[in-house]
């Protein structure tokens, strides 16, 4: 329990932004990747990543790396963050970037150097129309470098739900078709 960064905590902050919902994964050389949200209102959060060295110094600059920069994620949503087993991280979330009062699930894979493997603002799990895709969970197959994303899918009124999933290539291409796979079909909750 010895404090390795001194008696006082290291504060990562901005004079113009609020940071919330932090998550940390182990990276290379004793370093860590910090993922957090940057809320700018109730439905205007973004996601950012920082890398800290063993002394708590920011390695990717004060602004870090933007994971999701469209600002259409609810500020109360906590992104899912998992290590990739290769000193990087996987981040999943849902947002309403289409502007149609529906949310869709997205995933991003960031390397230990801060490079994004997937397109800017993440890869979308499903392009199925007139559906919400909430509460994504992410997993990574280190041997194949494939990413798996699973979510709860609902129709617009949210009276029915099911579990759907998608497999992504190392560069973020959908491998299970544009609508993903159905694991539990839509049905009314019991």
What are these regions (language model features)?
Residues 1-190:
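Extracellular, repeat-based ectodomains that mediate carbohydrate processing or recognition
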């Amino acid at each position: 329990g010895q404090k390795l960064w001194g008696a006082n905590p290291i504060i990562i902050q901005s004079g113009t932004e609020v940071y919330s919902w932090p998550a940390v994964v182990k990276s290379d050389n004793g370093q860590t990747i910090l993922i957090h949200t940057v809320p700018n209102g109730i439905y205007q959060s973004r996601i950012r990543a920082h890398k800290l060295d063993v002394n708590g110094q920011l390695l990717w600059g004060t602004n870090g790396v933007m994971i999701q920069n469209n600002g259409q994620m609810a500020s109360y949503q906590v992104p899912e963050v998992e290590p990739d087993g290769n000193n990087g991280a996987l981040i999943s979330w849902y947002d309403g970037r289409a502007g149609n009062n529906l949310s869709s699930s997205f995933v991003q894979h960031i390397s230990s150097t801060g490079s994004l493997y997937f397109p800017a603002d993440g890869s979308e799990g499903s392009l199925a129309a007139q559906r919400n895709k909430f509460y994504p969970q992410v997993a990574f197959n280190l041997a194949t470098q494939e990413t798996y994303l699973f979510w709860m899918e609902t129709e617009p009124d949210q009276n029915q739900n099911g579990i759907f999933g998608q497999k992504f290539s190392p560069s973020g291409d959908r491998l299970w078709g544009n609508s993903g796979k159905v694991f539990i079909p839509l049905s009314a909750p019991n």
